[in-house]
């Protein structure tokens, strides 16, 4: 993609309304545009990142055995009355009426709808377990939306729901998502720590929030520093191995970690002083086991092996991709701009032509772009008629993992410059060797 033909409305000045780094950089880098309080348009660069985040989430959900579907944003109020949450949910829920005066709502979550879908199709324990997920936009009318997409009113969510015959099966489903979340966040370049958390309006008696540490975090968190060095479950993890998954979850919950709502000062004081960590954190995922809270009142029942009907046990598992984009920036930036992890960068390579209009550099850049794209790399080619300094600033601001810098002097020597955005390291490479070098760098 040539930058001269791309839509990238970069801002030179930091918007006054942006309070935290991610909000400032997303606006400056032309990723988003505010349309109303807590409501944002995702511009092309931002949408590419959002889509790549979703790809990682989807891959790990599929790996865990969850099955994707898509539910509508508009829901019937009657479903929520069945569960008893319609009146209890509060003003965060956007309530509407259609032309026939039927009460509807813009879904803030989907427990009721997924339960209705399940109960209409599943009648026997032989059809269990089931784990279903969808990725859909939601709306919650926050009292004070702030921090850009970190705490917006409209946001993208991945919601998964598990259905099991009994608590033991439901705990295994919970453990699957626990491990899938650890892997998801690691692939996104984040170190997430699972912490005991309140269940809130979702309900239930078991819940973990996945927290990344950040100075701009909304929550106070308390944990053992050892979590920062815990190994991530490998790609070879067998999600059907009940004992192995339980051992992984036991390991990841073996030390103290809690949000402020669940904090126990006496237990935290028992952690060795050098290992104690009190910090601020950003919630990037939340999982719940809530038993029969929804299946009982909504009649989601199956016949067990004894011939008796019983309500299914359920869990709910959420990740907010639009929130995650901001969280990744909070965890990975410097004074010059964003530093994207390879897995979610909008383009793999920024190709900088330092003398646009020069026959040699134009031809070399066109050839390099063709070779890199043929090798499966995405390239944003800065072919604008701008000063080199402006091109360097743009490349650093938008944070592409690699910068290929092409100028007349280097070309005369048969070389181009390659810069790694994360470290600032530079090297010279022959143009025809770039694709192999970048593949090697991505693998390493």
From Swiss-Prot:
<dbReference type="GO" id="GO:0004827">
    <property type="term" value="F:proline-tRNA ligase activity"/>
</dbReference>
<dbReference type="InterPro" id="IPR045864">
    <property type="entry name" value="aa-tRNA-synth_II/BPL/LPL"/>
</dbReference>
<comment type="function">
    <text>Catalyzes the attachment of proline to tRNA(Pro) in a two-step reaction: proline is first activated by ATP to form Pro-AMP and then transferred to the acceptor end of tRNA(Pro).</text>
</comment>
<protein>
    <recommendedName>
        <fullName>Proline--tRNA ligase</fullName>
        <ecNumber>6.1.1.15</ecNumber>
    </recommendedName>
</protein>
<dbReference type="InterPro" id="IPR033730">
    <property type="entry name" value="ProRS_core_prok"/>
</dbReference>
<keyword id="KW-0067">ATP-binding</keyword>
<comment type="subunit">
    <text>Homodimer.</text>
</comment>
<dbReference type="InterPro" id="IPR004500">
    <property type="entry name" value="Pro-tRNA-synth_IIa_bac-type"/>
</dbReference>
<keyword id="KW-0547">Nucleotide-binding</keyword>
<dbReference type="GO" id="GO:0005524">
    <property type="term" value="F:ATP binding"/>
</dbReference>
<keyword id="KW-0030">Aminoacyl-tRNA synthetase</keyword>
<dbReference type="InterPro" id="IPR050062">
    <property type="entry name" value="Pro-tRNA_synthetase"/>
</dbReference>
<dbReference type="Pfam" id="PF03129">
    <property type="entry name" value="HGTP_anticodon"/>
</dbReference>
<keyword id="KW-0648">Protein biosynthesis</keyword>
<dbReference type="InterPro" id="IPR004154">
    <property type="entry name" value="Anticodon-bd"/>
</dbReference>
<dbReference type="InterPro" id="IPR036621">
    <property type="entry name" value="Anticodon-bd_dom_sf"/>
</dbReference>
<dbReference type="InterPro" id="IPR002314">
    <property type="entry name" value="aa-tRNA-synt_IIb"/>
</dbReference>
<dbReference type="GO" id="GO:0005829">
    <property type="term" value="C:cytosol"/>
</dbReference>
<dbReference type="Pfam" id="PF00587">
    <property type="entry name" value="tRNA-synt_2b"/>
</dbReference>
<dbReference type="InterPro" id="IPR006195">
    <property type="entry name" value="aa-tRNA-synth_II"/>
</dbReference>
<dbReference type="InterPro" id="IPR044140">
    <property type="entry name" value="ProRS_anticodon_short"/>
</dbReference>
<keyword id="KW-0436">Ligase</keyword>
<keyword id="KW-0963">Cytoplasm</keyword>
<dbReference type="InterPro" id="IPR023716">
    <property type="entry name" value="Prolyl-tRNA_ligase_IIa_type2"/>
</dbReference>
<dbReference type="GO" id="GO:0006433">
    <property type="term" value="P:prolyl-tRNA aminoacylation"/>
</dbReference>
<comment type="similarity">
    <text>Belongs to the class-II aminoacyl-tRNA synthetase family. ProS type 2 subfamily.</text>
</comment>
<dbReference type="InterPro" id="IPR002316">
    <property type="entry name" value="Pro-tRNA-ligase_IIa"/>
</dbReference>
């Amino acid at each position: 993609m040539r930058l001269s033909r791309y839509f990238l409305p970069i801002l030179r000045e930091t918007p006054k309304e942006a309070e935290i780094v991610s909000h400032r950089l997303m606006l400056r880098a032309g990723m988003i545009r505010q349309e109303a309080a807590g409501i944002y348009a995702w511009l092309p660069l931002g949408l590419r990142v959002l889509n790549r985040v979703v790809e990682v989430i989807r891959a790990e959900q599929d790996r865990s055995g969850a099955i994707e579907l898509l539910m509508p944003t508009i829901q019937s109020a009657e479903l929520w009355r069945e569960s008893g949450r319609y009146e209890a949910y509060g003003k965060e829920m956007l309530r509407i009426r259609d032309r026939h005066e039927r009460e509807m709502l813009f879904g803030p979550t989907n427990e009721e709808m997924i339960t209705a879908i399940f109960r209409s199709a599943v009648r026997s324990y032989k059809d269990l377990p089931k784990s279903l997920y969808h990725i859909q936009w939601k709306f919650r009318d926050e009292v004070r939306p702030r921090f850009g997409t970190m705490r917006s009113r409209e946001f993208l969510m991945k919601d998964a729901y598990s259905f099991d015959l009994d608590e033991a099966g439901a705990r295994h489903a919970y453990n699957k998502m626990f491990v899938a979340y650890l892997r998801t966040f690691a692939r996104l370049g984040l170190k997430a720590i699972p912490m005991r958390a309140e269940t809130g309006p979702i309900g239930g008696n078991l819940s973990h929030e996945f927290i990344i540490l950040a100075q701009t975090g909304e929550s106070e968190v308390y944990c053992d520093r050892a979590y920062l060095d815990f190994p991530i479950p490998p790609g070879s993890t067998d999600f059907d191995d009940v004992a192995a998954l339980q051992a992984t979850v036991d390991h990841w919950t073996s030390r103290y970690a809690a949000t402020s709502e669940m904090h126990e000062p006496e237990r935290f004081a028992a952690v060795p002083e050098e290992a104690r960590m009190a910090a601020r954190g950003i919630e990037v995922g939340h999982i719940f086991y809530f038993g029969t809270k929804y299946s009982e009142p909504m009649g989601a029942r199956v016949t067990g092996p004894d011939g008796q009907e019983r309500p299914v046990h359920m869990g709910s598992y959420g990740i907010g991709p639009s929130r995650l984009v901001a969280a990744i920036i909070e965890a990975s930036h410097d004074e010059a701009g964003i530093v994207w992890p390879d897995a979610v960068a909008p383009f793999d390579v920024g190709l900088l032509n330092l003398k646009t209009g020069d026959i040699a550099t134009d031809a070399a850049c066109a050839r390099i772009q063709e070779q890199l794209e043929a090798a499966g790399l995405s390239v944003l080619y800065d072919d604008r008629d701008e000063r080199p300094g402006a091109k360097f600033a743009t490349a650093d601001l938008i944070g592409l993992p690699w910068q290929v810098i092409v100028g007349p002097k280097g070309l005369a020597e048969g070389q181009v410059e390659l810069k790694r955005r994360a470290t600032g390291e530079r090297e010279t490479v022959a143009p025809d060797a770039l694709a192999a070098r970048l593949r090697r760098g991505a693998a390493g």
